[in-house]
């Protein structure tokens, strides 16, 4: 009985982790429009001195946002990115990564 209970806990834990880490693309797009679009442009296409961030792997986007959230400087706009990333939760980072992975800018 203990083994069955243990396996159930492990299974639900794994499912929870995957559901959180998968990210919600729609929520990510909303958060992107709220916090990121002014510098990185429509669908993360990049603008002026701000890099293109769309089409990157989820692991890359997640790692970069977590690095900035932790206050670590990486590039020329690090102070701004640190300020923008510090309030992000793990779920918001996963959502942003899910959105940006497949975001495509379409010319109007």
Predicted regions and their residues:
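Positively charged n-region of N-terminal signal peptides that target proteins for export
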Residues: 1-6
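Axial heme c-ligation environment in periplasmic c-type cytochrome domains
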Residues: 47-54, 69-104, 108
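Sequence context surrounding c-type heme c attachment/ligation sites in exported
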Residues: 26-37, 54, 58-63
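Bacterial N-terminal signal peptides
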Residues: 7-17
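Short acidic-aromatic loop segments in the C-terminal HATPase_c
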Residues: 37-40, 66, 73
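The canonical Cys-X-X-Cys-His
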Residues: 35-42, 96
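Electrostatic cytochrome c docking/interface patches
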Residues: 15-31, 42, 46-51, 104, ...
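Short hydrophobic/aromatic segments of transmembrane alpha-helices and their interfaces
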Residues: 43-44, 64, 76
């Amino acid at each position: 009985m203990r083994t069955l209970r243990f396996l159930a806990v492990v299974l639900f834990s794994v499912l929870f982790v995957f559901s959180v880490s998968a990210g919600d693309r729609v929520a990510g797009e909303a958060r992107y429009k709220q916090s990121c679009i002014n510098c990185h442009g429509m669908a993360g296409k990049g603008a002026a001195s701000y890099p293109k961030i769309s089409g990157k792997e989820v692991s890359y986007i997640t790692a970069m946002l977590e690095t900035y959230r932790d206050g670590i400087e990486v590039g020329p706009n690090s102070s701004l990115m640190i300020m923008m990333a510090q309030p992000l939760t793990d779920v918001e980072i996963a959502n942003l990564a899910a959105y940006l992975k497949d975001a495509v800018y379409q010319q109007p």
